[in-house]
Amino acid sequence: MLMSRISYRRLDGILLLDKPAGISSNSALQVARRLLRAKKGGHTGSLDPLATGLLPLCFGEATKIAGLLLDSTKAYDADVLLGTTTTTDDAEGAVLLTRPVPTLDAEMVDALIPQLIGRIRQRAPIYSALKQGGEPLYAKARRGEVVNAPVREVEVHAIELLFLATPRLQLRVTCGSGTYIRSLVRDLGEILGCGAHINALRRRWVAPFQIPKMLTLDALEQALSAGRDPDSLLLPLVEGLAGFPALELDAQRLACFRLGQRLRDHSFQTGRVAVFSRDGIPAGLGEVDSEGLLVPQRLFNL
């Protein structure tokens, strides 16, 4: 018996997925892509399999801004278990060390948290997707090799203690790109002198989607089974450009921009800009230098 092949089509937009625990970000993307029958898709930075929450998925022309969302500010809620360190810095790893948890109160923890706020140096978990010698660190760790995880500078904007009842506490973290919450929790555990690991992690938002209306994979499947138009379940690409200054071009200049030509105008705002037609259709992203030269970077075919 021959099985019918799925017919994929062009689909442009952003799905705000509520990723479930126990599945990788790429697996979640592939499930959503099959359900939507989208030809082209990409995610905007991995969430650990243990983690849940917002995973923006970009389809079609929106994949051209996936890297920009990867660099966005993000917010998380972390459930932390004190007294135990693990190989992965979360509940999925093997226990490395167990230590007694000191008597703590919120005032004591709040007094120590500022050590982890601002521009800080952070060692990545050895079980992470960071590459070393062209290979993810986790692949080396799984083979039992000694992994020297890199130390990188990251930015943590805020950490709020939401709950404390030792040996558990809950944190709300707002941070910049590249920050590992597992590393942050591990380092807090060392500051407290007892060690710690993440028991559960949820990503609340990714800029510019600070109040996201997320869909689970089950809800997505149900909506499509009920006959919903796939396009109606996605945000338009323009929603992902909200963090950039908008620059409108007239038809003549827009035609040049779409051909990849550079444009000069001292009235242009310096920095990265989202370029639009006069009728509000996004044409691409560009960079304006100090001389007012607009250099096309990503062009949209909408």
From Swiss-Prot:
It comes from Xylella fastidiosa (strain Temecula1 / ATCC 700964). Keywords: Isomerase, tRNA processing. GO terms for molecular function: RNA binding; tRNA pseudouridine(55) synthase activity. InterPro entries: PsdUridine_synth_cat_dom_sf, PsdUridine_synth_N, PUA-like_sf, tRNA_psdUridine_synth_TruB, tRNA_sdUridine_synth_fam1_C, TruB_C. GO terms for biological process: mRNA pseudouridine synthesis; tRNA pseudouridine synthesis. Responsible for synthesis of pseudouridine from uracil-55 in the psi GC loop of transfer RNAs. Belongs to the pseudouridine synthase TruB family. Type 1 subfamily. The keyword DNA damage does not apply. The active site is at residue 48. NCBIfam families: TruB. HAMAP family: TruB_bact. This is tRNA pseudouridine synthase B. It comes from the Bacteria. Its EC number is 5.4.99.25. The gene is truB. It catalyses: uridine(55) in tRNA = pseudouridine(55) in tRNA. Pfam families: TruB-C_2, TruB_C_2, TruB_N.
